[in-house]
Amino acid sequence: MKIAIDAMGGDHAPKAVVLGAMKAIKEYSDLHITLVGKEEEIRQYLTSEERITILHTDEKIESTDEPVRAVRRKKQASMVLAAQQVKDGVADACISAGSTGALMAAGLFVVGRMEGIERPALSPTMPTVDGEGFVMLDVGANVDAKPIHLYQYAVMGSVYAEKVRGIKNPRVGLLNVGTEDGKGNELSKQVFAMLKDAPINFVGNVESRDLLQGVADVVVCDGFTGNVALKSLEGTALALFSMLKEQLMSSFTSKLAAAVLKPKLMVLKDKMDYSEYGGAALFGLKAPVIKAHGSSNDQSIFSAIRQTREMVAKEVIPTISSVMEKEPLQ
């Protein structure tokens, strides 16, 4: 199995990418990795070249670049070359912690959209209080959506949750303003009716306040709604941890309490740590394309590689294609 990785994407590249890749190579004997980027910088952190190949390029996509224009003009950019490796059949999948918009453009223009899928979806795995997490799609690939798009998101998310996350008969929920049937705008109502007849375990509408309680294994929404919900959850979690830290450091007695509680707090932090869940998959493309978090450390990169390897090994893309062929809905 071969995975191409944009070694220059992310806040801590190439160090975090190289260290994460070496960790994955040690863990998985069937894995070969191509690191795409500036060879001189990559070699500063590469202590072993076992099953690791470097594809040198001096060009990369900057966070300030306009995504679509950058992908079209910077043909030798590390992210574009990683996607090209997939298109050419040299690699089975690709990963980048670089610009989300640019990776979506590279996925569409270079890797290509899966036949029958109208719009790809960006899908991270979000943490829950029980540590199991849930798949959420779309969180920003498309801010506007039609009912058919959300129907396809639900099917793709269900296949992923079962194949990669090992959830038997995953529960699929539609993010809405209430749990009752008939709630929401016209889009929500149409999608609800379609999902009731879909080849999935549809559990109905779910509210954003219940997401972290693990009310569903897959949560479906349009990209605008998903992005707002995602950032609200992230912001709330950061604010709560910040307030908790402030209170625990406010006095001598509270500092003593913090010392006692530290092991439990670390368990809680690990449960809510996105780095353990991998990256956000771009569903709807011809091959696995994974967007790692921009601030990914080596553990985050390792988790993204593990996730990508599972997608390839469990044949997620062929399975989605097969399901969509059996259940055509235009």
Swiss-Prot record:
Q: Does the keyword ATP-binding apply?
A: no
The reaction(s) annotated as catalysed by this protein in its Swiss-Prot or TrEMBL entry are: a fatty acyl-[ACP] + phosphate = an acyl phosphate + holo-[ACP]
Task: Please state the Enzyme Commission number of this protein.
Answer: 2.3.1.274
Q: Which GO terms describe its biological process?
A: fatty acid biosynthetic process; phospholipid biosynthetic process
| Biochemical pathway | Lipid metabolism; phospholipid metabolism
Q: Which residues form a coiled coil?
A: none
Q: Which UniProt keywords apply?
A: Cytoplasm, Lipid biosynthesis, Lipid metabolism, Phospholipid biosynthesis, Phospholipid metabolism, Transferase
Q: What is its main location?
A: cytoplasm
Which InterPro entries would you find in this protein's record?
FA_synthesis, Phospholipid_synth_PlsX-like
Location in the cell reads:
Cytoplasm
* GO-annotated cellular components: cytoplasm
- What's a Gene Ontology MF term here? phosphate:acyl-[acyl carrier protein] acyltransferase activity
Report the domain of life of the source organism.
Answer: Bacteria
Magnesium in keyword set: no
Question: Per its UniProt entry, what is the enzyme's top EC class, as one word?
Answer: transferase
Function of the molecule: Catalyzes the reversible formation of acyl-phosphate (acyl-PO(4)) from acyl-[acyl-carrier-protein] (acyl-ACP). This enzyme utilizes acyl-ACP as fatty acyl donor, but not acyl-CoA.
Self-association and partners: Homodimer. Probably interacts with PlsY.
The record's listing under NCBIfam families reads: plsX
Family, per entry: Belongs to the PlsX family.
| Record protein name field | Phosphate acyltransferase
**Which species expresses this protein natively?**
Bacillus thuringiensis (strain Al Hakam)
